[in-house]
Amino acid sequence: GYLDYDEVDDNRAKLPLDAR
């Protein structure tokens, strides 16, 4: 998921938690 930068597996890898 994209809840955290290190566990991200989507194209949102560089977006902050608020930008999900």
UniProtKB/Swiss-Prot annotation:
Conversion of fibrinogen to fibrin is triggered by thrombin, which cleaves fibrinopeptides A and B from alpha and beta chains, and thus exposes the N-terminal polymerization sites responsible for the formation of the soft clot. Its main location: secreted. Keywords: Adaptive immunity, Blood coagulation, Coiled coil, Disulfide bond, Hemostasis, Immunity, Innate immunity, Secreted, Sulfation. The modification Sulfotyrosine is found at Y5. One of its GO terms (biological process) is adaptive immune response. It comes from the Eukaryota. One of its GO terms (cellular component) is extracellular region. It is found in: Secreted. Cleaved by the protease thrombin to yield monomers which, together with fibrinogen alpha (FGA) and fibrinogen gamma (FGG), polymerize to form an insoluble fibrin matrix. Fibrin has a major function in hemostasis as one of the primary components of blood clots. In addition, functions during the early stages of wound repair to stabilize the lesion and guide cell migration during re-epithelialization. Was originally thought to be essential for platelet aggregation, based on in vitro studies using anticoagulated blood. A long coiled coil structure formed by 3 polypeptide chains connects the central nodule to the C-terminal domains (distal nodules). The long C-terminal ends of the alpha chains fold back, contributing a fourth strand to the coiled coil structure. Heterohexamer; disulfide linked. Contains 2 sets of 3 non-identical chains (alpha, beta and gamma). The 2 heterotrimers are in head to head conformation with the N-termini in a small central domain. This is Fibrinogen beta chain. It comes from Ovis aries. The gene is FGB.
